[in-house]
């Protein structure tokens, strides 16, 4: 059987960077990793309406820097920065009290070409009982207008309320998953419908990049 590797992890340090950047001793590593998970879960649950694309976490000795890429920065920042202050207060309950918290909010330039937001759009449409073929077609058309070079969408589960679960996918353009220099964006989402959960997977091909693997002098 064919084995599938995660498209983003497969391209780390080639076209993708790590979403968490820090170093910890073996003693503190589990605690730091648990903090990262809690931070990401907080953003996922409490900022779900902000159109979050990705969250990057950078740590220094006494500072945690959170970079949030979003399509709606106003929801996160709030009036006069009140939203940022609320997030910081909530995060202080999660992370080490001695660490300073810094939050940067980056607005996405091309919303319709982002795999996370495309998957989120399809999931929302499915939850509104829109037929899966119509939802995927709308998402693909929006991505094509955003000038992506290729897109693939897969929806799995009891499609349109069918008795037997199945998977269906649609692809437009090129999506070269075996080419390491290909700039592939990938995301998964779940849609809660009256017939159960539907899984949504989205691959977006944004062209090829020249690999920039860092050289390490020995």
Swiss-Prot record:
GO terms for biological process: translation. Residues 39-109 form the KH type-2 domain. GO terms for cellular component: chloroplast; cytosolic small ribosomal subunit. The keyword Ribosomal protein applies. InterPro entries: KH_dom, KH_dom-like_a/b, KH_dom_type_2, KH_sf_prok-type, Ribosomal_S3_C_sf, Ribosomal_uS3_bac-typ, Ribosomal_uS3_C, Ribosomal_uS3_CS. It is found in: Plastid, Chloroplast. GO terms for molecular function: rRNA binding; structural constituent of ribosome. CDD domains: KH-II_30S_S3 (cd02412). Keywords: Chloroplast, Plastid, Ribonucleoprotein, Ribosomal protein, RNA-binding, rRNA-binding. The keyword NADP does not apply. It holds the Pfam family Ribosomal_S3_C. Belongs to the universal ribosomal protein uS3 family. Part of the 30S ribosomal subunit. HAMAP family: Ribosomal_uS3_B (MF_01309_B). This is Small ribosomal subunit protein uS3c. It comes from Rhodomonas salina (Cryptomonas salina). The gene is rps3.
């Amino acid at each position: 059987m064919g084995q599938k590797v995660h498209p983003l992890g497969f391209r780390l340090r080639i076209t993708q960077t790590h979403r968490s950047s820090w170093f910890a001793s073996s003693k503190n590593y589990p605690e730091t990793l648990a903090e990262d998970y809690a931070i990401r879960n907080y953003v996922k649950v409490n900022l779900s309406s902000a159109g979050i694309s990705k969250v990057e976490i950078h740590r220094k000795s006494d500072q945690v820097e959170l970079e949030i890429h979003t399509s709606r920065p106003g929801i996160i920042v709030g009036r006069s920065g009140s939203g940022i202050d609320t997030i910081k207060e909530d995060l202080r309950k999660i992370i080490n009290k001695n660490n300073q918290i810094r939050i940067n909010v980056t607005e996405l330039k091309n919303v319709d070409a982002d795999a996370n937001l495309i998957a989120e759009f399809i999931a929302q449409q499915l939850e509104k009982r829109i037929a899966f073929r119509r939802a995927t077609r709308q998402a693909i058309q929006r991505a094509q207008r955003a000038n992506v070079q290729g897109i693939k969408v897969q929806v799995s589960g009891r499609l349109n309320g069918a008795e037997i679960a199945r998977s269906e996918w649609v692809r437009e353009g090129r999506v070269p998953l075996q080419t390491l220099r290909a700039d592939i964006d990938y995301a998964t989402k779940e849609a809660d419908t009256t017939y159960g959960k539907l899984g949504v997977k989205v691959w977006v091909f944004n062209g090829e990049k020249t690999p920039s693997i860092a050289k390490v002098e020995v």
